[in-house]
Amino acid sequence: MQPPGPPPAYAPTNGDFTFVSSADAEDLSGSIASPDVKLNLGGDFIKESTATTFLRQRGYGWLLEVEDDDPEDNKPLLEELDIDLKDIYYKIRCVLMPMPSLGFNRQVVRDNPDFWGPLAVVLFFSMISLYGQFRVVSWIITIWIFGSLTIFLLARVLGGEVAYGQVLGVIGYSLLPLIVIAPVLLVVGSFEVVSTLIKLFGVFWAAYSAASLLVGEEFKTKKPLLIYPIFLLYIYFLSLYTGV
């Protein structure tokens, strides 16, 4: 009877590990196959992803960009156009009541000029000056722009520190006295003497309101050189209204 031999070598299956010595580890090679895993995220996601890829490949990826809402894009229309109705109303009161004793900060008309307020005043004055002739509107606006430019250049020559926008705003707002006397002239138009006095009063009112804002202390003895052309400018505005 033969003695029992050594037990047979254990052959590992696919699910077992095989331990080898470090000397034999250098001769080992192989690969691990990745499992085929598929996720079903729905047909809509696949279509959207395909469309996105298609657009990006052809340079239209900017169509897919989503911008955050900017609070500045939701401003009211008046704010977008830089129209401050309260500021315009305050400036109108400053022009119509130029007396310093009333306590208005009249320098705001000069120091904080705007465009829409004077433009509205000039357009309103043009409308009441039509007399069936629409070309009067464009003519009055032209006189406003170039008349203000003349006053601006004269003020700069005399040494005044004033901008063209400031002159444009002051001259435009100061047309308000002529607008105020317009309905009065319709009533007393048949009385020549009274009508003439009202016209002179309106011109002096407008010229004083504009000159008191534009003529500063820097002019000193040169004030008449600037007040006189302002007075002539409003006489011309009045002549466009009365048809003289």
UniProtKB/Swiss-Prot annotation:
Keywords: Golgi apparatus, Host-virus interaction, Membrane, Transmembrane, Transmembrane helix. This is Protein YIPF4. One of its GO terms (cellular component) is trans-Golgi network. It is a multi-pass membrane protein. The gene is YIPF4. Interacts with YIPF3 and YIPF5. One of its GO terms (biological process) is endoplasmic reticulum to Golgi vesicle-mediated transport. Belongs to the YIP1 family. Residues 1-113, 160-166, 217-223 are cytoplasmic. Residues 135-138, 188-195 are extracellular. It is found in: Golgi apparatus, cis-Golgi network membrane. It comes from Homo sapiens (Human). It comes from the Eukaryota. Its main location: Golgi. Involved in the maintenance of the Golgi structure. The keyword rRNA-binding does not apply. InterPro entries: Yip1/4-like (IPR045231), Yip1_dom (IPR006977). The chain crosses the membrane at residues 114-134, 139-159, 167-187, 196-216, 224-244. Expressed in keratinocytes (at protein level).
